[in-house]
Design a protein with these regions (language model features):
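N-terminal, positively charged/glycine-rich alpha-helical extensions of SAM-dependent methyltransferases
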Residues: 1-15
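Conserved alpha-helix/loop element of class I SAM-dependent methyltransferases that forms part
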Residues: 24-42
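Class I SAM-dependent methyltransferase SAM/SAH-binding core
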Residues: 47-48, 53-103
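A short acidic, Gly/Pro-enriched loop at the edge of an enzyme's catalytic core
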Residues: 106-114
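Residues lining the SAM
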Residues: 116-120, 148
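A short glycine-rich, Lys/Arg-flanked "PGG" loop and its adjoining helix->strand segment in the class I
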Residues: 129-141
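C-terminal alpha-helical "lid/dimerization" subdomain adjacent to the S-adenosyl-L-methionine
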Residues: 148-202
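Core SAM-dependent methyltransferase catalytic element
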Residues: 202-246
Length: 246
């Protein structure tokens, strides 16, 4: 059985425990921030799916005073901790919190980017496409999605390496062994190629990996531009080619 993220005990231990479980946890968020900075405007609006206790929110808020965020999470306990964290750093005016799934948001394409970090591997396989579709539908035509999840892996050497990494990060040998034993119970993983195809079938394009540590993989997926936007872009290119500018 997966952990109960509505449990106060689980949530209180989450921030410390996640750094032991996920190799390169902090470097991951540095990568995400660097990529977002390279593509977003200073006034971007970002959707964070499964905001958890608010670590990625805090990290991004401290660096980007003009970005706005909408943060959703189905765990009220997680959400309350994230709200307190954001309030404590004086950034509540930049964040709208929503208790629930992405489907609880208004059905409008208003986000420049969406983050789904360590979330989709908890979603049942038959619900994954709907999960990504809800995100896709709420992105602007030029929006992008960034994900990071555990992939299906059958390579025993990678499992051994993961145990060594987690033990180096602070888990005991017994905890590492239990972690490996529980992977199939706690996660609904798919292979790298299946994950990529899932995003493409949802409607995303230019789907590629931006990060990997063992069986953890991060994807960037760009929303496919609408025909109207593509036609406008083509028109602008043609006008520029003929020396006409608006």
């Amino acid at each position: 059985m997966a952990k109960d993220f509505n449990s106060s005990k689980v949530v209180d231990e989450y921030d410390q425990h996640i750094r032991k479980l996920i190799p390169g946890y902090e470097m991951l968020h540095q990568q995400v921030d660097a990529i977002l900075q390279s593509v977003l405007s200073p006034k971007a609006h970002i959707l964070i799916v499964g905001c958890g206790t608010g670590y990625e929110l805090e990290y991004l808020l401290k660096k980007h005073p003009d970005w706005m965020f909408t943060a959703v999470d189905p765990s009220a306990t997680m959400l309350q901790k994230a709200q307190k964290l954001v309030s404590d750093i004086g950034k509540s005016d930049q964040v709208s919190f929503v208790h629930g799934e992405t489907s609880a948001l208004a059905d409008q394409a208003c986000f420049d980017a969406a983050l789904s970090i360590l979330v989709a591997h908890f979603i049942a396989d038959d619900s994954k496409k709907a999960f990504f579709q809800e995100i896709y539908d709420r992105l602007k035509d030029t929006g992008l999605l960034m994900t990071y999840d555990l992939m299906t892996c059958t390579d025993s050497q990678q499992f051994q390496a993961l145990q060594h990494l987690c033990q180096h990060n602070g888990l005991t040998s017994t905890q590492c062994q239990k972690m490996i034993e529980r992977l199939h119970q706690d996660f609904s993983t798919v292979r790298f190629d299946e994950y990529q195809q899932l995003l493409l079938k949802t409607g995303f394009e230019h789907v590629y990996s931006y990060s990997q540590i063992l069986m953890y993989q991060g994807f960037i997926a760009h929303k496919k531009q609408s025909n109207a936007l593509v036609m406008q872009d083509s028109k602008n290119v043609a006008l520029t080619h003929h020396g006409i500018k608006h």
